């Protein structure tokens, strides 16, 4: 059995966790009290959804997940919410005082008091697995817990479970909608620390998702619930192949093999289609070709950047629902003829395709329409360097004046860590730039007219 353990850190991680597990439960027909009427083989754990749920003798299905926050209020909502019976009380771990948007508190002072409890709990979950394949870590870059505690936890997971994959779902600080002034600091510190410990990180930019909700779902003022439900759909599409039997089952290591050409370049861009409200879906026919084309629209991306300015290194299309390979091949051939997509010259224009026959599920009463087919595209493109450049620029503006730095130093950090982290991100931008250069550029500049 190839189990995955989900770890939800900080407010963003926990709230994404709520949306994701709510959707998983609906998809698998698991009730809020963890019972699963459709599961006839009680106690037999060979069903594919057992990668994400463990089955108890009493026929309950418990998520293989841990929720961690350094302050209790957000996790308390889970403890008293609709799904309170779904989780084991020990899976919900909280501290007493929060990280106050401060990476140093999450990573050093407050985080280190709770990290052993969390690792113990993860160890217990790992012991219940027959063949653990890895961890999915949900967090934000901007918060103190999401940035500081996550990076501490990832370091420790690398020590304890060296060879296991670690995939992140990270909320990237939105350019316009910032919840904290120091988000650029936290983001850059956490990226620097986790860069070598993470195998693949799917970034989600709040602002991009705001725009999608506003534009495609006609929600004037999207709430976090709207955002998280949309993120839930995306996570569900990415993990569907692990939870259902499909024509092409992608496991965690397969993601890395196909999307990550170099260890540091592990930030795929996620695009999901169709995001459409019920009123519109009624009047539109969403064919395979249409949803595939929608994936190449910058407007449907989860991070604000323009792939038309970058080059693709790899591309995965994960379809679910009523989709046949013939339609997919036609859609891809059509896209290749348009040639709006530029691949790097050292990578053949390969699209990896996964088809899963389980149709997309929607949360009842939510904003998304029920559709018969959907697609999630994961592409590794050099355009995502734009996102890093934006963040680095903000970091520089503040750090030039050493604004807010004393809060970090006061919690036991050294100023050198800031410079070190910033240099690492400069190197990351450079890496992206080099990867996008044509391999012929280096040797011979004149022969530029072989088009």
Swiss-Prot record:
Keyword Calcium appears in the UniProt entry: no
CDD domains assigned: alpha_tubulin
Annotated site location: Involved in polymerization: 451
Active-site residue list: 254
Modification N6-acetyllysine, positions: 40
Keywords in alphabetical order: Acetylation, Cytoplasm, Cytoskeleton, GTP-binding, Hydrolase, Magnesium, Metal-binding, Microtubule, Nucleotide-binding
One of the record's GO molecular function terms: structural constituent of cytoskeleton
GO process terms (BP): microtubule-based process
GO terms under cellular component: cytoplasm; microtubule
Catalytic activity, EC: 3.6.5.-
UniProt KW Lyase keyword: no
Cofactor field: Mg(2+)
Sequence positions that bind GTP: 11, 71, 140, 144-145, 179, 206, 228
SUPFAM superfamilies: Tubulin C-terminal domain-like (SSF55307), Tubulin nucleotide-binding domain-like (SSF52490)
Entry comment on modification after translation: Undergoes a tyrosination/detyrosination cycle, the cyclic removal and re-addition of a C-terminal tyrosine residue by the enzymes tubulin tyrosine carboxypeptidase (TTCP) and tubulin tyrosine ligase (TTL), respectively.
Catalytic activity reported: GTP + H2O = GDP + phosphate + H(+)
Predominant location: cytoplasm
Location in or out of the cell: Cytoplasm, Cytoskeleton
Residues that hold Mg(2+) according to the record: 71
InterPro entries: Alpha_tubulin, Tub_FtsZ_C, Tubulin, Tubulin/FtsZ-like_C, Tubulin/FtsZ_2-layer-sand-dom, Tubulin/FtsZ_GTPase_sf, Tubulin_C, Tubulin_CS
PROSITE patterns (alphabetical): TUBULIN
Gene3D superfamilies for this protein: Helix hairpin bin, Tubulin/FtsZ, C-terminal domain, Tubulin/FtsZ, GTPase domain
Family, per entry: Belongs to the tubulin family.
Subunit organization: Dimer of alpha and beta chains. A typical microtubule is a hollow water-filled tube with an outer diameter of 25 nm and an inner diameter of 15 nM. Alpha-beta heterodimers associate head-to-tail to form protofilaments running lengthwise along the microtubule wall with the beta-tubulin subunit facing the microtubule plus end conferring a structural polarity. Microtubules usually have 13 protofilaments but different protofilament numbers can be found in some organisms and specialized cells.
Functional note: Tubulin is the major constituent of microtubules, a cylinder consisting of laterally associated linear protofilaments composed of alpha- and beta-tubulin heterodimers. Microtubules grow by the addition of GTP-tubulin dimers to the microtubule end, where a stabilizing cap forms. Below the cap, tubulin dimers are in GDP-bound state, owing to GTPase activity of alpha-tubulin.
Protein name: Tubulin alpha-1 chain
Organism field: Homarus americanus
